[in-house]
Amino acid sequence: MKPRFFIDMDGTLAEWRDIKSNSELYQKGYYESLKPNNYLLEEVKNLIKEGKDIYILSSFLSDSDYALKEKNIWLNKYLPELPVQKRIFVPYGDVKYKYLPSKITSFDYLIDDHTKNLLDWKEEGGTVIKFLNGINHIKGVWQGLLLREDENISKNFNWILDNCFKEPVNSFEFQNLDEDLEMEI
């Protein structure tokens, strides 16, 4: 079965910017001006070039005049190689997997920074990878696949691809492939 990769935007493909008030999320230019997490962005571009089945799966504020439009502008700028048909936007608060084109299998990977999204996905039978963006996973309680935004992302992601498709791995953590891997199956 061919794996599918569903990648979150806010805090994953794009930075998560600290805000003083939720009203900032409704301001024109907020989403369009987010900086990309460049290591992950480059890895996603490489996966698309390799013919992998890649989707964006991102929540948006449905009561915002700008959020959805600006997320598409952002994707057009930073990831133009991803067709519009592969962009799935979910109203904030809704469960992401309910918006997929078909039922989740263990070969459907969600890369997301938000634990609730990952737990929902895993409960439906998908495989989850928590994206570490520098502001999440502070307490280190996540017990599952981890992918860190750093220069080793390509090596680490390739390790996941090479080792997790035959049988999904329940949990492991690594920071650098040159170090020992901690695995728990």
Feature locations, PLM:
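Short amphipathic alpha-helix with an adjacent loop that forms part of the alpha/beta core around
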Residues: Y97-I104, L145, D150-S171
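Active-site neighborhood of HAD-like aspartate-dependent phosphohydrolases
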Residues: M1-K35, K45-N46, M183
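Short catalytic/ligand-binding loop motif for oxyanion handling, primarily in non-cytosolic enzymes
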Residues: A14-R17, I54-I56, D63-A67, V95-Y99, ...
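Non-Sec secretion/translocation targeting segments of pathogen effectors
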Residues: D178-I185
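Acidic, Mg2+-coordinating phosphoryl-transfer loop and its flanking beta/alpha structural elements
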Residues: Y109-N152
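Substrate-recognition element of Asp-dependent hydrolases with the DxDx(T/V) motif
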Residues: K35, L40-E70, L75
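A short, structured active-site edge motif that brings together acidic residues
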Residues: L57-S62, N72, N76-K98
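Conserved Lys-Pro-Asp/Glu-containing loop-to-beta segment of HAD-superfamily phosphomonoesterases
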Residues: F89-W121
